């Protein structure tokens, strides 16, 4: 990669640090995480971490357009990202380095509308790279500029508001236990964001039973919220096909085709799930 004109080396504290590729720089620049250490991709020490951040700060944002982490030819997630990248939106920030992008995001004259205007030109790797150069205070300051407001039965994302998810899980998915836990949480003012159950078992019959339970609870007390049973997307699709009261679709996703395969999903399946959710009627406007 260095032969492509990308600088992946820096001298720091009397030592020259050189990285094999951009992925190695990104990994080493991350804050310390035990999972990265176990995976063998973390920086060896704090100095190497700082050296990776030096390299990242001077890296032009354009680099990420030509050096994707997973090959375009073999990965459908990469193809989705590259094919949807908006060159016109990117033009505003195209001359910047990753470090310059951080300064641009933090600048007083960069407001939420300005960030939204370039958002379609920001690849996930660009966002990940700049976050590695930001302190927590920086991330908070940048995020505070942006408003993402969503509405279903309740509204989330308004300035100065806080919403809470109620999670009435039960070790055996016992409906009575879940109902009792849900009522307890509601009495404490939780659940305005959503009532979401992580089921102990992922099966269609159990999922449908829990969906009806939450729907009856919400309807009986006229609670302005939405519910979700966090099952695999195929289970949720099947529940919709059987007329279950699905409000929200859930699915864990990853950043590569191979990782998504580990979750048992593809982009086609995700699109199918979204279409199923959007097809719901009868007062439901489910979100995928």
Where are these regions (language model features)?
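Alpha-helix-loop-beta-strand connector modules within alpha/beta enzyme cores
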Residues: 138-144, 150-151, 158-164, 205-232, ...
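Long, compositionally biased, glycine/small-hydrophobic-enriched stretches that function as flexible linkers
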Residues: 1-147
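Catalytic cores of alpha/beta
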Residues: 177-179, 233-246
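Active-site beta-loop-alpha junctions enriched in small/polar residues
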Residues: 167-171, 198-200, 228-235, 252-256
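Catalytic alpha/beta core domains of metabolic enzymes, predominantly
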Residues: 241-288
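Conserved, mostly hydrophobic/aromatic
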Residues: 185
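Active-site mouth loops of central-metabolism enzymes
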Residues: 81, 160-178
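Glycine-rich, proline-tolerant flexible connector loops at the mouths of alpha/beta enzymes
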Residues: 118-119, 123, 130-138, 193-214
